[in-house]
Amino acid sequence: YWSVTRFADIMEVEANWQSFSSDPAITIIDPEEDFPLPMFIAMDPPKHDEQRMTVQGSVAPKNLKNMESTIRGRVQKVLDSLPVGEPFNWVDKVSIELTTQMLATLFDFPFEDRSKLTRWSDVATGGPETGIVESEEQRQEELLECLAYFTNLWEERAKQGLSNDLISMLAHGEATQDMSPQEYLGNLILLIV
């Protein structure tokens, strides 16, 4: 474990990834050996850079500009639906809902199923000790359901031309099109969370 906070030190660490490796994990807790979820944030160059570059176009200024009217419309609809003169849960009604809607947009994920994204985020980041799932087995089962759902989307997008959504970029990207299922799931979890 290491923590770097000064600018000069950060620059040194960034330039010396061989000594300050992100592989196989970026957390204090060791990665699960029986259910590994490799993701590009926990990889070193050049693989990290290649996979990150594959998807960064989805949030490039030009792409975000193209989504501006959709984003504004969804924000307005959520805000207009809020109760007036009575208390409400801001996190549930605004934060989670808007985040989930934006994720659905970035993935070009079926909008009617967007609540699955929130569930999978919660399951990915919380084990049985959090009360989100009852067991590690349930957690893994739900993450495999996530993988199955996204694999269907991947297969659809792979047959289509390249688009600006994250799944299409992963399916067509030279650095990501041949990922293992576990690596695909790991990168999905990274992008969802």
Say what each PLM segment does.
Residues 11, 49-53, 96-101, 144, ...:
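Non-catalytic, well-ordered alpha-helical scaffold segments
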Residues 69, 73, 148, 186:
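Short, contiguous clusters of charged residues that form electrostatic/catalytic patches at enzyme active sites
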Residues 96, 104, 146-147, 173-193:
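Central I-helix of cytochrome P450 enzymes
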Residues 78, 119-177, 181:
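Cytochrome P450 catalytic core segment centered on helix I
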Residues 1-91, 100-118, 122-132, 136-141:
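Active-site substrate-recognition loop segments, prototypically the cytochrome P450 B′-helix/B-C loop
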